[in-house]
């Protein structure tokens, strides 16, 4: 288990928890002074009232909650959202309403999930040629349905 420092930006904020022993992520809750409305085809930057610090070997990914996506057409717009190890500001979630009805978020509603994942840094080696593959440059549906 990796150590993550977490800071409540308000004493009324509740900390995220794993809901089951097999859960990969923890639900993040909205921290709001009053309910907000996300209209269809609109987004909103939802505050959580939390900030964190963790090792540079990791990132926190912000992902949609499957229930909100399946039942209400609400998703995290930049899925997965990345929280870098050197970011110390408030964690905020860009929610988007793909549905046809207004979506209301109340204080402490669970709106997304966060997952701690390892980061493997890249080292580039510039080249004029890449190794051939059977697929080649085919993309965007080139392998069939």
Where are these regions (language model features)?
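DUTPase catalytic domain/fold
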Residues: 1-145
């Amino acid at each position: 288990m990796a150590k993550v420092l977490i800071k409540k930006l308000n004493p009324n904020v509740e900390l995220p928890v794993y809901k089951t022993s097999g859960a990969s992520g923890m639900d993040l809750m909205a921290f709001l002074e009053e309910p907000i409305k996300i209209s269809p085809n609109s987004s909103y930057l939802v505050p959580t009232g939390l900030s964190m610090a963790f090792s540079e070997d990791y990132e926190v990914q912000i992902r949609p909650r499957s229930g909100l996506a399946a039942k209400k057409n609400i998703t995290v717009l930049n899925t997965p959202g990345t929280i870098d190890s050197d970011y110390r500001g408030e964690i905020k979630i860009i929610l988007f309403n793909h549905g046809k009805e207004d979506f209301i978020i109340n204080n402490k509603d669970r709106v997304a999930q966060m997952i701690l994942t390892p980061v493997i840094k890249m080292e580039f080696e510039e080249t004029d040629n890449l190794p051939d593959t059977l697929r080649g440059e085919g993309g965007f549906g080139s392998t069939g349905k």
